[in-house]
């Protein structure tokens, strides 16, 4: 009888705690999202309210317990928040997107140490709600998942792996878990387009072997099919690098069955070099891609490179290796992504810089980004506009996370700036 009495009471307490969790994440996340939606200038008032409803109803419950109840912090982004905002800027329009680590109630508990089952459950829930195909996600999750015991073993092996990959002189972080799955929403008017990201590192830490072959074998069996030559181009390039296990994350567009032929796969990799010659090597895929679009994009990027690596005075040559902030840092200096589409001959390559590792302060980063915007004739470079937008969206530093760059003839310079809301004191 005692258990019967306690059952409803526990249930009521669980409901109350979950409501408190959502109130907390509402305070952390919603003001920044609303602020950037307004600043983008691309959304009507009705669009903004629709996007805020989607955020509250679909995303906030998936962020898991608030920090005081969570089994451990999120390590996906700087500052411990499992949610990151970004804004895509071009000369024609700006767009907001966000990404969150899939945690839910059970993620990082003993039942689901790396939130792998939680990721699968979330994918199933989103696919049912938005009518998405799971053909690609099922293949990737099955290829990269571990059992509960294997996941726990991977967690136990993490300290050794971190020491091996840490910058010399960096502070050793006390990491208790590892991100596995995260989801992104690109906000398009009142709708969203969805991406799923899955990290390879848990499997690699557990097995001690690269998971790249597993990924490339999976891609070769996807339908609609990718061109084997495009997959080979990426695989051969990566196998010729000095970096050990450079492939970090795979992402897929989540679409309905009828639009799989238009969906993309993106492969995210790290580089331990940050010279501009390294950028050239990656963007041309080892010198194999030298079309007019790629070369023009490189020329424009070179003209702004000193601003992105926070060297406004300029750099002497393309061999320069720029020192980075060392605290809690792996040996990763830059990131690149390869984008594949079914039937596409040549992958597209995008450059990513972890700005928090380069900028001595947010104020200097703001000055440098405003200078870069002026070079692109973007209005955010004028009269301190960029600085005001991000100070309004994020009440406390650090503001800057990462920067992404790609050029295409249709859209011109396409930059994405990533920012993470700070965690707040709990009520």
Curated annotation (Swiss-Prot):
Entry binding sites for substrate: 97, 195, 264, 266, 268, 352
Cysteines joined through disulfide linkages: none
Pfam families reported in the protein's UniProt record: Trp_DMAT
Free-text disruption phenotype from the record: Abolishes the production of all prenylated paspalitrems, but accumulates paspalinine and small quantities of paspaline. Simultaneous disruption of idtB, idtC, idtF and idtG eliminates the biosynthesis of the whole spectrum of indole-diterpenes reported to be produced by C.paspali, including paspaline, paxilline, paspalinine, paspalitrem A and paspalitrem B.
Species: Claviceps paspali
Pathway linked to the protein: Secondary metabolite biosynthesis
EC top class, as a word: transferase
Record-given protein name: Indole diterpene prenyltransferase idtF
């Amino acid at each position: 009888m005692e258990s019967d009495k306690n059952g409803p009471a526990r249930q009521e307490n669980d409901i109350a705690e979950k409501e408190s969790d959502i109130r907390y994440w509402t305070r952390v996340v919603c003001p920044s999202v609303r602020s950037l939606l307004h600043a983008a200038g691309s959304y009507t008032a009705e669009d903004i309210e629709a996007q805020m409803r989607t955020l509250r109803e679909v995303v906030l419950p998936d962020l898991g317990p608030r920090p005081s109840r969570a089994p451990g912090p999120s390590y996906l982004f700087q500052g411990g928040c499992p949610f990151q905002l970004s804004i895509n800027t071009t000369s024609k329009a700006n767009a907001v997107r966000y990404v969150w680590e899939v945690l839910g109630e059970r993620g990082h508990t003993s039942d689901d140490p790396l939130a792998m089952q939680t990721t699968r459950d979330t994918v199933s829930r989103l696919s049912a709600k938005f009518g998405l195909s799971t053909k690609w996600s099922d293949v990737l999750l099955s290829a990269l998942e571990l059992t509960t015991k294997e996941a726990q073993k991977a967690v136990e092996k993490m300290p050794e792996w971190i020491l091996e990959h840490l910058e010399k002189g960096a502070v050793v972080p006390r990491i208790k878990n590892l991100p596995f799955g995260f989801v992104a929403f690109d906000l398009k008017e009142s709708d969203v387009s969805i991406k799923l990201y899955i990290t390879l590192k848990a499997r690699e830490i557990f097995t001690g072997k690269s998971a790249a072959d597993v990924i490339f074998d999976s891609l070769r069996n996807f339908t609609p099919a990718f061109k084997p030559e495009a997959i080979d181009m990426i695989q051969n390039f990566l196998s010729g690098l000095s970096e050990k296990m450079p492939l970090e994350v795979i992402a897929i567009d989540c679409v309905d069955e009828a639009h799989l032929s238009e969906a993309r796969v993106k492969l995210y990799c790290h580089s331990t070099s940050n010279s501009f010659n390294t950028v050239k090597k990656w963007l041309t895929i080892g010198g194999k891609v030298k079309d007019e679009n790629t070369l023009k994009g490189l020329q424009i990027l070179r003209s702004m490179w000193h601003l992105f690596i926070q060297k406004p005075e300029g750099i002497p040559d393309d061999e320069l290796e720029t020192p980075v902030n060392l605290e809690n840092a792996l040996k990763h200096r830059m990131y690149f992504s390869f984008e594949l589409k079914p039937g596409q001959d040549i992958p597209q390559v995008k450059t990513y810089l972890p700005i928090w590792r380069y900028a001595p302060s947010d104020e200097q980063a703001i000055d440098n980004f405003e200078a870069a915007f002026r070079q692109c004739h973007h209005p955010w470079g004028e009269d301190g506009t960029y600085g005001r937008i991000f100070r309004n969206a994020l009440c406390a530093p650090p503001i800057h996370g990462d920067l992404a760059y790609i050029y295409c003839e249709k859209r011109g310079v396409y930059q994405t700036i990533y920012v993470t809301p700070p965690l707040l004191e709990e009520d």
